[in-house]
Design a protein with these regions (language model features):
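A cross-kingdom feature that marks ATP-driven nucleic-acid transaction machinery
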Residues: 329-500
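Phosphate-binding site recognition
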Residues: 1-370, 472
Length: 500
């Protein structure tokens, strides 16, 4: 009888969880981690970070719906030009949140030390012995210059929260570099205090397909792939898609015309995340001009930003925020580092939106034209890089240790240049030379294309040891068309595999 009652309780609990999470697409690991932390018997200090618009706030509010004791969101610095008034604005907003959630009998705080003392009083008054979740969203925005915010926040955790077993403090931020430097890698009062870090990544192609299905928006894999090439799997962006409209129509409404949904998103994005938005935009604008990227020295020369601490911090912040990545090009000394743009949305914005934002039908009018052809190729390559695990599974090498690289050899008067955008260098002595081709039908390899591919294979072979074998691997939307020149291909990965 006890077992039967327990079974009923478990079924009710499971049904409640399923209902609570029914609105969340993917994020299974993150939800499981939050549940584990919520049910622990110790104080928890959790930092959740990731690119702006990636769904951090939505995840917390849905996963812990009905279980948050206090929540507050920092005020965006966008449109706040007066540095002196920013601290006052943040403190006022925090005080009003305290009042709205039950604080009584206290005047507005003048310092952050006072503000967190008021939060302690509120939590003590609401304490019934159960878990108390304190959720502070966009925490980095609250740390305005010379405000004394960080020492007060340190004191709040070290002096009060850490001694209460039922406290779960969750902080979020789009300014990933702030979260990492001030919380994760803090060398002061918050050193080693985080009990958990959760990095929220953009949706995969599979998760985007799940979202569109959940929203009852009918889209083919081909169009979902194109939407990913534009919006990069950012949930907030694709939430603007409307059913009954094509990919082209939706993209035009979201990005182009007189009243696009994401008007001035590029500038607002950088202003909300970075302390030095103009320097960050300079770097991103430069990286958008060359797919293979630039070295630190090239970036400094082209942007006018001096080599040293300032540029290093800007590059580090962009890398940590997943706008750019750095890699050591194949065949170059390991000390040679290239930085390349990997944010799909920024790439598309700089390539097309800035110059054509008023053209309400830009995508619909140019989808099959040469204007978008070059972008299709570059953007598809980025999507492939973002789905390396799916590609490795399709190649049945998921368990084989490997490294990734790209190879770019500039030609001269004596020899042609060679560019390989993805190499999978495996520990089993096989190198997958990956060619990524976006096409609306099976890709046909011509005689000229076969000659070019053989040249690349021979050029790469000259740099490898005799033990290593090269597998030409075609990654395409609909596969390679069978023909007299397709025999050169060793392995294939199609669009279907990217959705796995």
């Amino acid at each position: 009888m006890v077992y039967f009652a327990g079974t009923i309780l478990f079924c009710i609990f499971a049904a409640t969880l399923n209902k609570r999470y029914s609105m969340i697409i993917g994020r299974k690991e993150e939800i499981a981690e939050l549940e584990k932390l919520y049910h622990s018997d110790r104080p928890e200090f959790v930092a959740i970070y990731g690119r702006r618009r990636v769904g951090k706030t939505f995840l917390i509010k849905q996963a812990l719906k009905g279980r948050i004791t206090f929540q507050h969101t920092g005020v965006s610095p966008v449109d706040q030009d007066n540095e002196k008034s920013r601290m006052k604005t943040q403190l006022e907003s925090f005080y009003y949140a305290l009042l709205n959630q039950g604080l009584e009998g206290y005047k507005a705080p003048k310092t952050w030390m006072e503000a967190f003392f008021l939060l302690e009083q509120l939590l003590q008054n609401l304490d019934n012995g159960e878990r108390q979740v304190v959720f502070i969203d966009e925490l980095p925005w609250m740390d305005t210059p010379r405000s004394g915010f960080l020492p007060a926040f340190e004191n709040f955790w070290n002096g009060w929260c850490s001694g209460r077993d039922n406290i779960m403090l969750i902080v979020c931020g789009s300014a990933t570099s702030w979260i990492l430097s001030n919380l994760s890698k803090n060398k002061g009062g918050l050193y080693g205090r985080l009990t958990a870090e959760i990095k929220l990544s953009p949706f995969t192609l599979k998760e985007c397909a799940m979202y569109f299905e959940h929203a009852n928006i009918q889209m083919s894999q081909y169009d979902i792939l194109q939407s990913y090439m534009v919006f990069g799997g950012i949930p907030y962006y694709i939430s603007y898609f409307q059913k009954g409209l094509s990919f082209e129509q939706n993209t035009d409404k979201i990005l182009f015309g007189n009243k696009p949904r994401l008007k001035d998103e590029f500038n607002r994005l950088f202003a909300a995340i970075f302390n030095n938005p103009e320097d960050s935009k300079k770097v991103v604008r430069l990286l958008a001009t060359r797919h293979s990227g630039f070295t630190r020295e090239e970036i400094s020369k082209a942007t006018g930003l001096p080599l040293g601490g300032g540029l290093s911090k800007t590059l580090a912040a962009l890398v940590e925020s997943d706008f750019i990545t750095c890699y050591s090009p194949y065949g170059m000394p390991k000390s040679t580092i290239c930085y390349k743009l990997i944010d799909n949305f920024c790439l598309f914005w700089l390539k097309y939106v800035e110059e054509n934002s008023k053209d309400a039908g830009f995508i619909s009018d140019n989808m099959t034209s040469d204007i978008l052809k070059a972008w299709h190729g570059v953007a598809f390559e980025e999507v492939c890089w973002q789905h390396i695990q799916q590609i490795k599974r399709a190649l049945e090498i998921g368990g084989v240790k490997s490294s990734l690289s790209a190879w770019n050899v500039r030609g001269d008067e004596n020899q042609d240049g060679t560019q390989i955008d993805l190499l999978i260098i495996r520990n089993d002595n096989v190198v997958n030379l990956c060619e990524m081709k976006f096409a609306s039908s099976p890709y046909t390899i011509s005689k000229e294309e076969e000659i070019r591919l053989r040249h690349r294979i021979e050029a790469l072979k000259a740099t490898l040891s005799p033990k290593q074998t090269i597998h030409l691997t075609m990654i395409t939307t609909y596969g390679v068309a069978y023909g007299k020149h397709s025999g050169i291909v060793q392995k294939e990965v199609t669009m279907d595999s990217l959705f796995e």
